[in-house]
Amino acid sequence: MSSGSRSFFTPQETRLELPQGAAHQTPDITRPASPSENDRAPFLNGGPSDAREDVRMGAKALRNDSEKPAVGIMALAPILCYCAASITMTVVNKFTVSGRGFNMNLLVLLIQSTVGVTCVWIAERAGLIQLRGLNAKDAWNWMPLSIMLVFVIWTGSKALQYLNISVYTIFKNLTIILIAYGEVMWFGGRVTRIVLCSFLFMVLSSVIAAWSDISNVFAIGNLSMPHTPDSIMGGMAKDPITGALFPAFDPLKTEKDAINAQLQSASANDVIEGFQGYGLLSSGYVWMALNCICSATYVLLMRKRIKVTGFKDWDTMFYNNFLSIPVLLLMSFLVEDWSYANLHKNFPDDKQTKLISAIVFSGACAILISYTTAWCIRATSSTTYSMVGALNKLPVALSGMVFFHDPPVTFSSVSAIAVGFFAGLVYAFGKNKQAEAAKLGGHASANGSSSMSGSKDGSSLPMHTFNDRKD
């Protein structure tokens, strides 16, 4: 994953070669305009920024889109690695929590966070990355975010436990809508027509994905148990001649058994008492709704906190995982059953090694996703990365059908995935157009400021003043 013998995270030395005689010439010290808030918004929302140089990620890790090489064969490696890492992470998590009666989700997250901290610490000790040292002030400022992240990953694992991967992936898009309108209310963001159109497609795909459960609600509500004649009420009938009892034949027994099974299955998934039989209120959808709310809250809070702390990518990952360990440990002891019987139920002897290995591997996958994300942006561009993220939702959703055969391949499931995939493409296109418009506006204002400062004195160099900074 590195190029030659040089690590991706190692800073590269930048030299400026001056032409002969350049020392006697007046240098052009025009300073480019500072990035606007819209330019920095993608990074603050958890996505990539368009241009960023930092010793922690390599001096030339992330360059301007105009300096990026054209997407070709060399860019396939980071793109494929990013897609493979995200798909693997989802599939392994689904395998881990989908066991019969599994209820130790917080313990799984505790192990994953410990593995993540260990991997980052090893990379820092090996000199691959640089981390900010632990201090009480940063820990105190970041603790609310770590607690919120615990709820994000906990509710996400519970939703993934009860829902199939396709429905989970489709409903995860609704988080984007909450974040967008949260930015409108608190950060002065705006939603363009193209982005709004993508939101409508996201909602439509979610309705299609949940249509089977919605239909089940009306079907169960209209169920009526066939009447059983009094003569065979107890399952026995009496011979009118001898008076002897014999097993009665009920011609509606098959239909009754099917109705009872449907009612029992729907009631078993209810999380709210008093709504037995209504599959729409199953715990999977409740956990998914909570996950969307927690995820949006986490992203919006991080946008404020990251300005206060000045964290970089690896600092954020390290603090998130490190500070979440005591929170996960406390919540696991308070909420989950740590008895020997329950631990043996969740980690049976015949699957114990496989489950623990999968949990450790999924913790390492989180690090791999962060690395491949930066690699993909470095090798291509932030625009290409956003499109890859939208395209990647299709194989992630299809992975549930391939590995777990859930949901079955039906017109409804395929339509939901297709509409959700199209919604992601429209959203990525709309955000890219919005970013381009913001860049054009920034360049126009920069050129205007340069011409105004240069018009004061024809012999002076056009420069921006410090008051021109937007940050």
From Swiss-Prot:
Membrane topology: Multi-pass membrane protein
Location(s) in or outside the cell: Golgi apparatus membrane; Cytoplasmic vesicle membrane; Endoplasmic reticulum membrane
Region (Disordered): 1-52, 442-471
Compositionally biased spans, kind Polar residues: 1-13
GO cellular component: cytoplasmic vesicle membrane; endoplasmic reticulum membrane; Golgi apparatus; Golgi membrane
Glycosylated residues, chain numbering: N164, N222
Composition skew (Low complexity), residue ranges: 442-460
Gene Ontology biological process: GDP-mannose transmembrane transport
UniProt main location, coarse: Golgi
MF annotations from Gene Ontology: antiporter activity; GDP-mannose transmembrane transporter activity
InterPro entries per UniProt: TPT_transporter
Keywords attached to this entry: Cytoplasmic vesicle, Endoplasmic reticulum, Glycoprotein, Golgi apparatus, Membrane, Sugar transport, Transmembrane, Transmembrane helix, Transport
Domain of life assignment: Eukaryota
Residues annotated as transmembrane: 71-91, 102-122, 140-160, 167-187, 194-214, 280-300, 316-336, 355-375, 384-404, 409-429
Cytoplasmic side of membrane: 1-70, 123-139, 188-193, 301-315, 376-383, 430-471
Lumenal topology ranges: 92-101, 161-166, 215-279, 337-354, 405-408
NCBIfam families named among the record's database cross-references: nst
Entry-linked PANTHER family: SOLUTE CARRIER FAMILY 35
Known role: Involved in the import of GDP-mannose from the cytoplasm into the Golgi lumen.
Family label: Belongs to the TPT transporter family. SLC35D subfamily.
Subunit structure: Homooligomer.
Protein name (Swiss-Prot/TrEMBL): GDP-mannose transporter
Name of the gene encoding the protein in the UniProt record: VRG4
